[in-house]
Amino acid sequence: MSSDPHMLGIQGEQIAAAYLSRHGYRIIQRNYRYRRNEIDIIAKKHATICFIEVKTRASLEKGHPSEAVTPKKQKEIIKAAKSYLFSLGTDRCECRFDVIAILVRSMKQEEIGLYDLDHFTDAFQAE
């Protein structure tokens, strides 16, 4: 795993996408952008579209990774999700907002893959 925060985030998103695929999700799109807002992963499981925010950290020094999904960040994700649904020509569908939090246990190259992953389904709601 990289110690560079940007690379750590990219690696976390790769881990999350692989996890979702193994658990029956179909990845529709990664890094969907609407203006300055971004959704890390858009996936589908059964008939539900899942908008997934991935947060990866190398330590708990700044808190659990999921704590970085603040109310402000949630609003940004919701705006991007509405844009995505509009681009499909619908605003009526089964959808939810998930958070995947990854805490890397080791930054050593030979111990790559040592991490804790928490998947919070339906982590927040659009109002």
Curated annotation (Swiss-Prot):
Matching Gene3D superfamilies: 3.40.1350.10
Family annotation (Pfam families): UPF0102 (PF02021)
One of the record's GO molecular function terms: nucleic acid binding
InterPro entries: Restrct_endonuc-II-like, tRNA_endonuc-like_dom_sf, UPF0102_YraN-like
Protein family per UniProt: Belongs to the UPF0102 family.
Name assigned to this protein: UPF0102 protein Cpha266_0037
